[in-house]
């Protein structure tokens, strides 16, 4: 569990929290489209469920291509084209033939999730190739059942938002007995196979192209 060499974030508060936890050797407050490092500086990069929150991806991918060495790996994960369609409340309205309410809910959930992109691999391949990357491999994960746990966790977790605002902690009593029901509800989703044919997220392995 060695700390990553550099972490980037435009939001200072979570960046300082990550810094305090020792997640990064160096935490840098910056936009991903303005990385303050020279060309071909890094040998690899990772993005864990971040790119879907960035409205303009092209400048970010171009900047990432600039600071990565030729042949460097770029690994990331994002929600895919199945994400919105698998939301349980949206499907509930669809089954009642209230499609307009289902669409309204999907827009609402996408908004509170701060998603700008829930795209398929072909869309990502096009973006990546345009920025000088090649797609090495990808697979889907996180089943619709797991998404339902995540979806409802947003609502049942609202009291934790209050404790976070009041005391800076998501979990006030982090003990096994106090988290018994949380564990019971989430364990099946947590232990599911890592590759899911109908998964609503996609994991990508890419690398920066080596120019001939």
Where are these regions (language model features)?
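Residue-level detector of flexible, active-site-proximal loop/helix-junction positions
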Residues: 34, 142-145, 210
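S-adenosyl-L-methionine-dependent methyltransferase catalytic module, highlighting the catalytic core
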Residues: 58-63, 73-204
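Conserved SAM-binding loop
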Residues: 1-88, 204-208
């Amino acid at each position: 569990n060695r700390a990553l060499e550099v972490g980037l974030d435009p939001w200072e508060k979570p960046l300082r929290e990550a810094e305090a936890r020792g997640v990064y050797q160096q935490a840098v407050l910056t936009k991903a489209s303005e990385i303050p490092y020279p060309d071909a500086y890094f040998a690899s990069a990772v993005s864990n469920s971040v790119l879907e929150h960035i409205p303009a991806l092209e400048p970010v991918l171009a900047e990432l291509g600039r600071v990565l060495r030729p042949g460097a790996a770029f690994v990331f994960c994002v929600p895919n084209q199945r994400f919105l369609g698998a939301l349980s409340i949206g499907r509930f309205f669809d089954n009642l033939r209230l499609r307009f309410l289902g669409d309204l809910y999907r827009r609402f959930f996408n908004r509170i999730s701060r998603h700008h992109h829930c795209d398929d691999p072909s869309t990502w391949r096009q973006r990546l190739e345009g920025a000088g990357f090649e797609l090495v491999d990808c697979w889907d994960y996180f089943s619709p059942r797991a998404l339902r746990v995540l979806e409802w966790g947003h609502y049942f977790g609202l009291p934790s938002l209050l404790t976070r605002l009041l005391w800076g902690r998501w979990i006030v009593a982090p003990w096994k007995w106090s988290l018994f029901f949380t564990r019971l509800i989430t364990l099946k989703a947590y232990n599911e196979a890592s590759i899911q044919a109908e998964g609503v997220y996609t994991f990508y392995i890419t690398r920066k192209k080596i120019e001939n």
